[in-house]
């Protein structure tokens, strides 16, 4: 069963769109480096209170692949620095991990 990870980013007021894009691209590239598949950035266009929220989607073939990707990403000093950077344009994020339901 496919595992889908969604990370909703909540940006700080003030950063330029260019700075936000650079930050997201770096994180996406690191996620891909460590095995995340189908890494895609989305923005809520008609999403109620989530309208305008930037969301990163990534998939893994199964829970084993997801775990390996997460372990590798979180052990990477570049990812750690990106997540802990006080000058990041991202204030907070929420991650949701879901599993597909076959034959539905």
List PLM regions with ranges.
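Short amphipathic alpha-helical segments
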Residues: 15-39, 71-83
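Surface-exposed interaction/gating patches
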Residues: 1-14, 18, 102-103
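Glycine-rich beta-strand-turn "strand-cap" elements at beta-sheet edges
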Residues: 34-55, 78-104
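Short, well-ordered beta-strand segments in beta-rich or mixed alpha/beta enzyme
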Residues: 2-10, 41-74
């Amino acid at each position: 069963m496919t595992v889908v990870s969604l990370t909703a980013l909540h940006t700080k007021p003030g950063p330029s769109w260019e700075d936000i894009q650079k930050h997201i691209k770096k994180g996406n590239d690191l996620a891909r480096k460590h095995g995340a598949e189908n890494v895609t950035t989305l923005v809520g266009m008609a999403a109620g209170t989530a309208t305008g929220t930037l969301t990163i989607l990534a998939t893994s073939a199964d829970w084993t692949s997801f775990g390996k990707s997460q372990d590798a990403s979180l052990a990477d000093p570049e990812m750690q620095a990106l997540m802990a950077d006080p000058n990041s344009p991202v204030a907070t994020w929420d991650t949701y991990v879901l599993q597909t339901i076959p034959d539905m």
